[in-house]
Curated annotation (Swiss-Prot):
Coiled coil: none
UniProt function note: Required for the insertion and/or proper folding and/or complex formation of integral membrane proteins into the membrane. Involved in integration of membrane proteins that insert both dependently and independently of the Sec translocase complex, as well as at least some lipoproteins.
GO MF annotation list: membrane insertase activity
Recorded name of the encoding gene: yidC
Protein name: Membrane protein insertase YidC
Domain of life: Bacteria
Listed Pfam families: 60KD_IMP
Region described as Disordered: 266-291
Keyword Membrane: yes
InterPro entries for this protein: YidC/ALB3/OXA1/COX18, YidC/Oxa/ALB_C, YidC/YidC1/YidC2_Firmicutes, YidC_ALB_C
Similarity-based family: Belongs to the OXA1/ALB3/YidC family. Type 2 subfamily.
Principal location class: membrane
Gene Ontology process terms (BP): protein insertion into membrane; protein transport
Amino acid sequence: MKKKALLPLLLGVMVFLAGCDYSKSSNRDGFFYNTFVEPMSKVLHWLGHSVFNDDYGIAIIVLVLVIRIILLPFMLSNYKNSHLMREKMKVAKPEVDGVQEKVKRARTQEEKMAANQEMMEVYKKYDINPMKSALGCLPVLIQMPVVMGLYFVLRYRIGGGIAEHPHFLWFNLIHPDIWITIIAGVLYFIQAWVSSKQMPQEQRQMTYMMMIVSPIMIIWISLSSASALGLYWSVSAAFLVVQTYFANMYYEKVAQREVAPMIEKFKENNSNSNKKGKNTQVVSKNNKKKK
């Protein structure tokens, strides 16, 4: 669900970016400019000029790291919830599949409502909350205005500073650079691939689509934008690759450990149910023999 929601979101961002023009000073006003673009300009130029002695490349890298650290609690919570839901769904799958069959066979609205209600009861039984997965979009939504603010600061060189000291490593921060663009695209592909490794097979199709769509959109925007934006995306993607790899490795074990008592409980209940069934059969046979 989360990945499906990102596609129209990214397309909407493209339309938004194409429609805004801050090249003229008279256009530099309004809610979005005053809330995101102007503050981003001040932060970037304060870091670049005052803190890092006119090294705007380092300023952008530090800005990425600060944003990623702010988002880290949301991301870690999302990783944990995803792994917990995945492990719980493994336990609940037989019952979920049975209810889904009822939903498919339902012919009337009443039957569909009854089946959906039964599904909610199964989710409640296994402590599964599908709404938690929707929170996975929160870091993206938080970061989006920041990225768009940075985009306009770099595209229209709002605030000067970076235009006077544009050089970082091998490229010019205010002009497009093919190599940093390729690096950004490749890193976003790797990030999507690392994320997909922990997903069930049936959920990977949308992730595979994102592995193609995201890098293409990143490359497309970067080719017509200041390479500073490509630098931002490259550092952000590299951080995400490392974060995703270690978070998945850790929270997979945490989820398995937390769900283990639930699995044991249901195994014990099933075992007791089977014993009761066998005892009932034995009593029934003995009664028949007495007769």
